[in-house]
């Protein structure tokens, strides 16, 4: 993990944890123009992305993030944001009693204890796409363009070029295994869950959300695939995040 830090530490702290094929600096660059408030933003490049080393495990990633936040005195977090891969670390931060996390926004996560088929399928898919990319040297993967548009797909393709097969295996494992427990009412009222209607991760989470976090705020984006709403509508997306941060919490 490589820590990217923006803004002054006297402002409310936001932690941005990006999905696979998006670095922390990429995610910050996408969101920054649309934030209306002033924030201290911590946007790490997770393993295999940006200026970070290899991706080993979410525990290894979280140790690095926790060390940075603790050493810099950033123990009160206004928002932890995680998308897809980023939720593996964000979930740990949200539930760590060492921190006071006011809000959490998680997008496109397979909330499952052991999604073995999803892990196998993802590994196979990304390995195949890696081989195809090596042969074609495409500037933007056609499959990603179809889901996210050309500019976003170009950025993702650039990041994918440096991800190794070992990184793929470790990332897919991280995305498919969560230590789930029933969240308290207080934890649920501070949590927002976001999914595209066509998101394959929603197929897993739709079974576990009613069991472990039924009172969390839940939004399903009609017609969108995995993490695609954030790419298509970044301005509206960030506005909704800030509205959630400022909303009076309620379990009702």
Q: For the regions a protein language model found, what residue spans apply to each?
A:
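Active-site loop/oxyanion-hole signature of alpha/beta-hydrolase fold enzymes
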Residues: 42-79
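Flexible "cap/lid" loop of the alpha/beta hydrolase fold
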Residues: 91, 95-96, 101-132
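Conserved alpha/beta-hydrolase catalytic His-Asp/Glu region
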Residues: 115-117, 132-185
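Conserved HGGG/HGGXW glycine-rich cap/lid loop of the alpha/beta-hydrolase fold
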Residues: 2-51
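Conserved alpha/beta-hydrolase "acid-adjacent" motif
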Residues: 200-206
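Gly/Ala-rich beta-loop-alpha elbow adjacent to hydrolase catalytic centers
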Residues: 82-86, 90
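Catalytic histidine-centered segment of alpha/beta-hydrolase-like enzymes
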Residues: 224-238
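Short beta-strand/loop motif that positions the catalytic acidic residue
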Residues: 187, 193-195
């Amino acid at each position: 993990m490589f820590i990217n830090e923006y803004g002054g530490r006297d402002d409310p702290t936001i932690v941005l944890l990006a999905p696979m094929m998006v670095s922390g600096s990429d995610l910050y660059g996408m969101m920054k123009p649309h934030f209306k408030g002033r924030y201290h933003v911590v946007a790490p490049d997770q393993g295999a992305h940006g200026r970070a080393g290899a991706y080993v495990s979410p525990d290894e990633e979280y140790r690095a993030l926790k060390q940075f936040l603790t050493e810099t005195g950033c123990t009160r977090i206004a928002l932890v944001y995680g998308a897809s891969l980023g939720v593996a670390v964000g979930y740990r931060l949200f539930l760590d009693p060492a921190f006071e996390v006011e809000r959490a926004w998680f997008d496109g996560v397979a909330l499952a204890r052991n999604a073995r088929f999803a892990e196998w399928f993802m590994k196979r898919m990304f390995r195949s796409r890696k081989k195809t990319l090596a042969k074609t040297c495409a500037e933007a993967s056609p499959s990603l363009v179809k889901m996210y548009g050309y500019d976003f797909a170009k950025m993702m393709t650039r990041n994918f070029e440096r991800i190794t097969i070992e990184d793929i295996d470790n990332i897919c494992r991280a995305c498919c295994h969560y230590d789930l427990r029933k969240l308290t009412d207080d934890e649920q009222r501070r949590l927002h869950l976001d999914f595209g209607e066509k998101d394959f991760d929603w197929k897993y989470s739709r079974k576990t959300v009613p069991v472990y976090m039924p009172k969390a705020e839940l939004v399903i984006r009609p017609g969108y695939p995995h993490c695609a709403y954030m790419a298509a509508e970044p301005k509206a997306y960030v506005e909704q995040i800030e509205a959630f941060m400022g909303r009076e919490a309620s379990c009702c």
